[in-house]
A protein has these predicted regions:
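Conserved short loop/turn motifs at secondary-structure junctions
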Residues: 92-101, 258, 280-285, 348-352
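A cross-kingdom feature strongest in bacterial/archaeal respiratory oxidoreductases
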Residues: 157, 163-218, 330-421, 437, ...
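Hydrophobic/aromatic residues located in beta-strands of well-ordered beta-sheets
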Residues: 92, 117, 209, 276, ...
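Short, well-ordered alpha-helix to beta-strand connector turns
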Residues: 89, 152-153, 223-224, 273, ...
Length: 688
């Protein structure tokens, strides 16, 4: 197979992967060792969720609408056609995406101008993202790398179901909790590798873990206590813990004595820990939860603890897009609705996930030109006048920024045009820059990835570090490029024999230091950190990683790839003082509580056929008391209308969900994550 170093695109943690391709299809994803991030482990979403790259219905050539049909264009026609329309438009806006790379979002921003660039994230979600970034940058609290999470000795998870939204963090938390047994063994001078002895000494001793969520989580089995409550009440718990740790933090009134006793236990555990860790994120749909997490961390820091804070975002490049800035999707739709913008370019974004489908469709229908650049067939293509066929992560290069602010580069695995010369799939940044150049009647400036990165750094100093995330295209080892294929790669002459017996030249990669070939350097001892695949003489491939490490289980011999862009400052934020009121259930009104699923909540991996067989069917969760009031049982279909659409789903009963709320699986087909926290008024049994 042909490999390249890449970054997992299915959540915000940024695990390192080696995707393998054969015959123009992605065939598997292997874990790529990074001693600072994921070391030996990947979650199942990352390992098996790549099926969307191989879908047959992906846009493979640019198409333009003619009446009710689309006609296929070549690259030149697409650029000229789009440029003609953009020249006539009085105002062009661009809608970016948290699943597109820094380079692609920047190319769109350059095309439309910084003041016309919108992030493509809903306003509420963007506010939470900016708040999380503010806490990480200015809070004065250290953000640990994924590997470092394992060294903490007390963990508080506020409002985030980490097993479903950042599964690799959940594994790190499990390892952290086990640290108690290792400590006890170390006190008896037992070596770290003697696992049987450590388990024997530790028995069931664990470091304390406290979890808050709207319902049960998969971490409950190792948690000292789980608080199942509406999101506001979870935030109130966080504020109360912060006040108990430091009485200058805002107080919370109206807490009953049972809960106060639990708070005392949590405070004792956190205050007694040397290295407490607070985990929160944007997925609960609440800014107050993030503020509460920041307050707890600040209170612990004030007591002299070596405290860490981890924020989990929603998409692979959410943090990068937050650092870039721009208006929210709601602002962009407002521009289209008022008619002040008459052309819109949408980059790798299914807008139905970030705003109500009715509003998106109405806004796009008003625009004389809708241009979509994407590698998946999304619902908004129904409204598109021109579709540019972009390359997915496996066919392109770029930089993404993970939840801790680590910039990491992913590289192209294969060139799809080698197997089918009718395919015209370019990186989004290439399409957008080519269009920009055509509109301005000038030559293309960015002929390779390094040019884009230099342009990003010149325009946005906050991204200066991305230059160091990986070596540039001129990097060589003993004058050689690095091989993407192991030297036992076989049958290359026969691969295209069904098309033509004349073998064409291998694709030439001018963007990176890799070659689409087995010819090149692949020595384990070579001075490089970007490793496409692990191979060493006498070792089966994935077991060869020990040859690339400075010590077994340590860092890579020549340093782990990636560079941190966010470091905690010396100062700190003041305490957040707005404590939310507690949740009050109201008759005839229900609030949507967010549930997430590792298989199904992510926009791209839910398209993979293997995931579709593992995904739960969409459901609506009710508390038993609410179900009794409505007169429904598990399995009964209930319907509600939201935003002009009627949704009908089967009921599931959950004891953990508080009355007055309904649980929906966020991100599943037809259930946009933007629904979290919305109110429903007309929940009723569906008419058969």
């Amino acid at each position: 197979m042909q490999f390249a170093p890449s970054i997992c695109q299915q959540c915000s943690i940024g695990c390192n992967i080696s995707p393998g391709e054969r015959y123009g299809e992605l065939r598997r994803i292997e874990n790529r060792y990074n001693g600072t991030v994921n070391h030996y482990f990947l979650c199942d979403r990352g390992r098996f969720g790549y099926g969307y790259v191989n879908l047959k219905d992906r846009p493979r050539q640019p198409v333009q609408r003619r009446g009710d049909d689309f006609i296929t264009l070549n690259a030149e026609q697409a650029m000229q056609g789009a440029a003609d329309i953009l020249r006539q438009s009085k105002k062009v806006i661009g809608i970016g995406s948290p699943r597109a790379s820094i380079e692609s979002n920047f190319a769109l921003r350059e095309l439309v101008g910084a003041e016309n660039f919108y992030t493509g994230i809903a306003r509420g979600e963007q506010e939470r993202l900016q708040l999380a970034l503010k806490v990480l940058r200015e809070g004065g609290i250290y953000t640990p790398a994924l590997r470092e999470i394992e060294s903490y000795d007390a963990v508080l998870v506020l409002g985030e179901d980490v097993t479903q939204t950042g599964a690799r963090v959940a594994l790190a938390v499990r390892q952290a909790v086990k640290g108690k047994a290792r400590e006890m063994a170390a006190a008896q001078k037992v070596a770290d590798w003697q696992i049987a002895a450590i388990l024997n000494i530790g028995q069931r001793a664990k470091h304390p873990l406290f979890v808050t969520n709207v319902d049960d989580t998969r971490l409950d089995d190792i948690a000292a206590w789980t608080y199942r409550a509406p999101v506001e009440d979870q935030a109130r718990l966080g504020f109360a813990i912060a006040h108990a740790l430091d009485n200058t933090a805002p107080a919370v009134d109206g807490i009953d004595s049972d809960l106060q006793n639990k708070i005392d236990v949590i405070v004792q555990a956190l205050a007694g820990a040397k290295k407490p860790l607070i985990i929160s994120g944007t997925n609960a749909g609440s800014s107050e939860v993030i503020q509460a997490a920041a307050n707890v961390a600040k209170a612990l820091k004030g007591r002299g603890a070596d405290v860490g804070i981890t924020m989990i975002a929603r998409s692979v490049n959410s943090m990068g897009l937050g650092m870039m800035g721009g208006g929210s999707l709601d602002d962009a739709l407002g521009e289209l609705e008022t008619g002040s913008a008459d052309a819109v370019v949408v980059l790798e974004n299914d807008l139905h996930r970030h705003a109500s489908a009715t509003r998106v469709n109405a806004a796009l229908a008003k625009a004389p030109l809708v241009m979509v650049v994407d590698h998946q067939r999304t619902a908004i293509m129904e409204n598109a006048h021109l579709v540019l066929s972009a390359a997915s992560f496996a066919e392109s290069d770029g930089t993404v920024i993970n939840n801790e602010g680590r910039a990491q580069r992913f590289f192209q695995v294969y060139d799809p045009a080698y197997y089918d010369n009718k395919t015209i799939m370019l990186e989004s940044w290439r399409w957008l820059h080519s269009l920009h150049s055509t509109v301005e009647n000038r030559e293309v400036d960015w002929t390779q990835l390094d040019h884009v990165i230099d342009a990003v750094i010149a325009a946005m100093p906050q991204f200066a570090g991305i230059k160091d995330a990986a070596p540039d295209a001129t990097f060589r080892i003993r004058g050689q490029k690095l091989a993407r294929e192991p030297h036992r790669y076989s049958g290359r002459t026969a691969m295209r024999a069904n098309i033509s017996v004349h073998e064409p030249r291998q694709p030439q990669d001018k963007d990176t230091m890799f070659a689409f070939s087995m010819e090149g350097n692949n020595q384990p001892t070579a001075p490089r950190s970007e490793i496409p695949f692990a191979w060493a003489p006498g070792w089966n491939s994935p077991q060869a990683w020990n040859k690339f490490q400075d010590e077994v289980g340590g860092k890579l011999r020549h340093g782990d790839p990636g560079v941190r862009l966010i470091e905690a400052t010396e100062g700190g934020l003041d305490y957040f003082t707005t404590v939310p009121a507690s949740f009050q259930a109201q008759d005839g009104q229900w609030r949507i509580a967010p549930y997430y699923h590792l298989f199904g909540s992510d926009e791209l991996s839910q398209r993979s056929p293997v995931f579709q067989s593992r995904m739960p069917q969409p459901y609506i969760k009710l508390n038993p008391a609410d179900a009794a009031k409505l007169g429904v049982n598990a399995g009964t279909r209930v319907s509600f209308s939201y935003d002009g659409n009627t949704v009908t789903l089967p009921v599931e009963i959950s004891e953990g969900l508080a009355a007055g709320q309904v649980g929906l699986p966020m991100g599943m087909p037809g259930i946009a994550p933007v629904l979290a926290g919305a109110r429903l008024e007309d929940l009723r049994e569906a008419q058969q």
